Amino acid sequence: MGKIIGIDLGTTNSCVSVLENGKAKVIENAEGARTTPSIIAYANDGEILVGQSAKRQAVTNPHNTLFAVKRLIGRRFEEEVVQKDIKLVPYKIVKANNGDAWVEASGKQMAPPQISAEVLKKMKKTAEDYLGEAVTEAVITVPAYFNDSQRQATKDAGRIAGLDVKRIINEPTAAALAYGMDKAKGDHTVIVYDLGGGTFDVSVIEIAEVDGEHQFEVLATNGDTFLGGEDFDMRLIDYLVDEFKKESGMDLKNDPLALQRLKEAAEKAKIELSSSQSTDVNLPYITADATGPKHLNVKISRAKLESLVEDLVTRTIEPCRIALKDAGIDASKIDDVILVGGQTRMPMVQKAVSDFFGKEARKDVNPDEAVAMGAAIQGAVLAGDVKDVLLLDVSPLTLGIETMGGVMTALIEKNTTIPTKKSQVFSTADDNQGAVTIHVLQGERKQAAQNKSLGKFDLADIPPAPRGVPQIEVTFDIDANGILHVGAKDKATGKEQKITIKANSGLSDEEIQKMVRDAELNAEEDRKFEELAAARNQGDALVHSTRKMIADAGDKVTAEEKTAIEAAVVALEAAVKGDDKAAIDAKVEELSKVSAPVAQKMYAEQAQPAEGAAPHDEKAEKADDVVDAEFEEVKDHK
């Protein structure tokens, strides 16, 4: 059985890990980096770029470069947070037919899981290159505060990428796994404060030894799925735009190219200000007007940045307070504070956390890698490679149904350990009511309309009876991925209706299958492109070596031979400029054929003892050898 890899699918960066010799190892990508930007770009020639290559060209291709798409996953277009995002990103966010928030690039509308699948494919390929075998199974992490639709959409992204998602695991829980696996025996209670690129989570986790088993039990979790490093960047971008407007009277907000450069500069400045007291943002030729080009040059101090984001940092403290209250634990009883997510490198964030919990956070946990490592450990647990580890996670939000008067009646309270199953009996509101609609909700509000609607279904053919007499048993069942299955049963007739909750939007199975096929088609196109590039390289190498051979041969080549070879060289050069691999292969064969007699003639002359050619000369004259070496070298650098 192949390895089950662990993937941290982040808003800003993603990371992949695998368990080797009992230790979680982060795998470097093809560029040699341990994390990969979660950025996807659609180039003009149809090529799909993922990661660093997409990030590098973002400034020149802002409309077709998609970033922070995780913030849209499983969301409706009308949601306030989506409407806010539309004003901030240079790419288009559009309303899908089912009401979901989708994105548009290169004139094509796509679902967020499709975009995330491109990042997952890159992670999958990274793992396959390292392991030297096919990878088909993964554990993927999500923010603990993700609702059912968002979890389902993440699972869909895995399917589109060709992965069997064995488990969806919460990011703070994964970080605790990475931290706690090699800790001394005994009980610890830890706080995982996870402030990533787009989401914030806090979890209270108890790590205990139970009958020789390492038990990780989540006591409570809280968070905000629209608060992260991207918001910190945005504050800095707004400040730079305002400063430039004061100085030049020009508004950069309407210039996507300038905004993309500002985004890059703001992120860089924010990172620099974590280790230095001030930095310069210097962007020459940011825009131009009738008087000529304009340059942006703004000095920013750490104090200025802190004043811009103070309320964002403060916003993370209330969820910490609620999580402690829900867990029934005082801050003084926390043994360790673990910081996860790149944004926790900011000194102001670290100070706010240590002030609130009354202790310094641990420095031995890598905030960018811990989540992927924890996912890899969970993968090994599921594969049976790691024994004696038990993970008890919780449902982050209350689940219930809408009852008479527009009230939400809870069936499963928030912070209930999962997997879990709960049933409750309801009845009809009217006499002789023949059907009931089960409206499934997720959230903490008493008013049904104020909560997230996960879906509706009907239980029909209820025998006529006075109101309040029929007994309808509603069962909620949450699996280990935190995904909900709902059933309703008429106890009188035994008639039953069951559904796995797909958001009243979400992707249908047909749509997912189509996206899987599209992804496979892209993989096939990539393979063809690679083969074409290899054929072109082989053609170029043969042209070069043949020309060198003719030059070296001098008058040993007859005029007829020279003419025939030159014609074949020109034909091959023309073929190499085209996109037909078969044509290139045919011209390579043709040139090899017409140049072979000359090559043999020269080889025969060199082989005579009187000629005594040096061995390296002989190797250089052999056209075929040169072609092979060139071809291999080019392929290695791909």
Curated annotation (Swiss-Prot):
It comes from Pseudomonas fluorescens (strain Pf0-1). Residues 602-638 are annotated as: Disordered. One of its GO terms (molecular function) is unfolded protein binding. This is Chaperone protein DnaK. Belongs to the heat shock protein 70 family. Coiled coil: none annotated. Residues 614-625 have a biased composition (Basic and acidic residues). The gene is dnaK. Induction: By stress conditions e.g. heat shock. Pfam families: HSP70. Residues 604-613 have a biased composition (Low complexity). NCBIfam families: PRK00290.1, PRK05183.1, prok_dnaK. The modification Phosphothreonine is found at residue 199. Keywords: ATP-binding, Chaperone, Nucleotide-binding, Phosphoprotein, Stress response. PANTHER family: HEAT SHOCK PROTEIN 70KDA.
